[in-house]
Amino acid sequence: MKFTTLATIASTLLFAANANADTCNPLKSSDCSPVPALGSSFLEKFDNGLGPHFESLKKQGTIDSGSNGLSLTMKKRFDNPSFKSNFYIMFGRVEVVLKGAEGKGIVSSFYLQSDDLDEIDIEMFGGDPYQWQSNYFIKGNTATYDRGGYHDIANPLKDYHTYVIDWTKDAVTWSVDGSVIRTIPKDNAQGFPQSPMAIYAGIWAGGDPSNQPGTIDWAGGITDYSQAPFTMGIKSVLVADYSSGKQYSYSDQSGSWESIKADGGKVNGRYDQAQDDIKKLESGQSVDSNDSSSSPSASSSDSSSTSSASSSSSSSSPSSTTSSSSSSSSSSSSSSSSSSEKSNAVPSASVIVFIGTKGGDKTTVTSSSGVSVPTSASVSTAAGTTSGSANSAPASAASSTASTVFISTGDAAPSSSASEKPSVSTTENNGAVSVAKTTSLFGFVALIGFLFV
């Protein structure tokens, strides 16, 4: 029995090491493989599953589809239904029609994230019916949480709104229902996201009682699971890649957009074409499918989804998302910056080893794959230009001022006690760290040695 138990633990540690090895940060390695480019435009209405461009992260919870798009539902603690794109865009426009989930401490997330941890976020909080949050991170830097902005909106948890992220080499702009809400210029003091990004969406419990106080406050309070189910809706997603080609790669480790190479295409090479595509798709027309040869899916993928007639700018359709990476992180240690995957509580060692870090005077928790959520309350000052919000409503006094993201990785069942979560403590370190992989490997070697003592 002892041998079996140790062997099982050893295998899970090895699995964790291998899982971490699959994630390659181009700023830390010059051997990262190119990522698949979209290189085209499409509109997905999710009337028959996730469609050809998205894939489930296979977390607990349910993702249902129908005439009203997707429903991502948490039925119990540790659920974290979430999905991601099977392509990347290099500058582009993403429109999502969504409705956030109701429920104190429940976070509905939709965001873009790159392999070197640039990130652009849209988040809603189930206990705040008056606001949504825009946020961004640069190269996984979570030393401060002053990039987030809170914006008034009417009924984001009951009504569907169209949220737009327009990302160019010069600025990032968030819009809601046709009105510009916030703009971040490329030369802002906090830095600028400029590397190929995938799309993530999901719902998770930031208010799980095992999370750190800062995370719970940010999410809006302790989650009451007796009020489940919690459901976020996503009716449609329109994506237009501003670059062309079959795949994107990093030519050096600078992380600048000028270092990105487009195989068979050009960075920013289809901006004008994308604008035409967007107009057609929003008006219910199809777009030229010739670009779809650049898509990671079969050439028919774009033609099938782009022919969908739903207008992504319509505020009447639902849409919702999640932290990739955002899976619910019931333990603040299980949350990781928007890379979407995970459940509300602490995962077992078979999933990943989480690293506790400190940034300034705030303790944060990150995973090796992404940024982190705040673990102690902090005041944020939104950078960038904020416009008057569409459908303004009184701001909720209960809204937290801590702004940040989420996410965690892993599939295994969470441990029952926060004290059981594996962690390694470091200081003055932010962004994705590779300690998890090293920790898992050392643990594996130690266990193997123990077996033969």
UniProtKB/Swiss-Prot annotation:
Disulfide bonds join 24-32. InterPro entries: ConA-like_dom_sf, GH16, Glyco_hydro_16_CRH1_prd, Glycosyl_Hydrlase_16. Residues 1-21 form the signal peptide. It comes from the Eukaryota. GO terms for biological process: carbohydrate metabolic process; chitin metabolic process; fungal-type cell wall organization. One of its GO terms (molecular function) is hydrolase activity, hydrolyzing O-glycosyl compounds. The gene is CRH11. Belongs to the glycosyl hydrolase 16 family. CRH1 subfamily. This is Crh-like protein CRH11. Keywords: Cell wall, Cell wall biogenesis/degradation, Disulfide bond, Glycoprotein, Glycosidase, Glycosyltransferase, GPI-anchor, Hydrolase, Lipoprotein, Membrane, Secreted, Signal, Transferase, Virulence. It is found in: Secreted, Cell wall; Membrane. Residues 281-343, 362-397, 410-430 are annotated as: Disordered. Disruption phenotype: Leads to increased susceptibility to cell wall-perturbing agents. Glycans are attached at residue 290. The lineage of its organism: Eukaryota, Fungi, Dikarya, Ascomycota, Saccharomycotina. A lipid is attached at residue 430 (GPI-anchor amidated asparagine). It is a lipid-anchor; GPI-anchor. Dual chitinase/transglycosylase that plays a role in cell wall architecture. Chitinase and transglycosylase activities are coupled. Required for the polysaccharide cross-linking at the septa and the cell wall. More specifically, transfers chitin to 1,6-beta-glucan in the cell wall. Plays an important role in fungal pathogenesis via its functions in cell wall assembly and regeneration, filamentation, and adherence to host cells. Chitin binds at residues 123, 204, 215. GO terms for cellular component: cell surface; extracellular region; extracellular vesicle; fungal-type cell wall; hyphal cell wall; plasma membrane; side of membrane; yeast-form cell wall.
